[in-house]
Amino acid sequence: DRNDVNRMIQTATQHFGKIDIVINNALVGFKFDPNQQKSFKDLTWEDYQQQLNGTLKGAFNVTQSVIPQFIEQQSGCIISIGTNLYQNPVVPYHEYTTAKAGLIGFTRNIAAELGQYGITANVVSGGLLKTTDASAVTTPEVFDLIAQTTPLRKVTSPQDVANMVVYLASDEARGVTGQNITVDGGLTMN
């Protein structure tokens, strides 16, 4: 809800004095369970809409709410969390992957328009993460298979993704914007 987001931004600004970094990391009602995933023929537009609303509408509302402050400060950092599945849909999570792919376009447009104000915008796209609430149903065999197909011979951890987020939020990354950086152990090298 846009009003709730505006209140959240206002509360955070009052508490911290200003906001420097926004991380868009919404996941609405989704589990990475290939056995429960609907096939495309069984999906409804409402299934898509739920993921589009959580991912894109959520990022839109948060980003639009904080932009006036970022423009006034002449700085700000927007980091959105994506997925490597848009490059290699090993499991066709249609609605989730489509929403996250849209997040890349959203982010690149924000970067192009707002860079003139010192604002950076990037996406960090993780692979299968070991282990999160969303990947809790993933079998050990799948984790092993992914590990064996990556050059690093490991499954990405939440800490691996967090490390990239911390880098992009730092002053060392002020020259990085409009990028989708994939953190998946090299699984989707391109």
Locations of the language-model features?
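Substrate-binding pocket helix/loop in short-chain dehydrogenase/reductase
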Residues: 5, 33-40, 44-49, 134-135, ...
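Catalytic Tyr-X3-Lys loop
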Residues: 20, 41-60, 75, 79, ...
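Active-site helix of classical SDR
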Residues: 63, 99, 107
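A conserved structural motif in NAD(P)-dependent oxidoreductases
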Residues: 150-161, 172
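Alpha-helical segment proximal to the catalytic Tyr-Lys
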Residues: 68, 112-113, 174
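Short, small/polar-rich loop/turn modules that mediate ligand/substrate recognition or access, typified
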Residues: 17, 115, 120, 176-178
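Short C-terminal tail/terminal secondary-structure segment
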Residues: 88, 148, 166, 177-190
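Active-site loop-to-helix junction immediately N-terminal to the catalytic Tyr of the SDR YXXXK motif
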Residues: 38, 89-97, 109
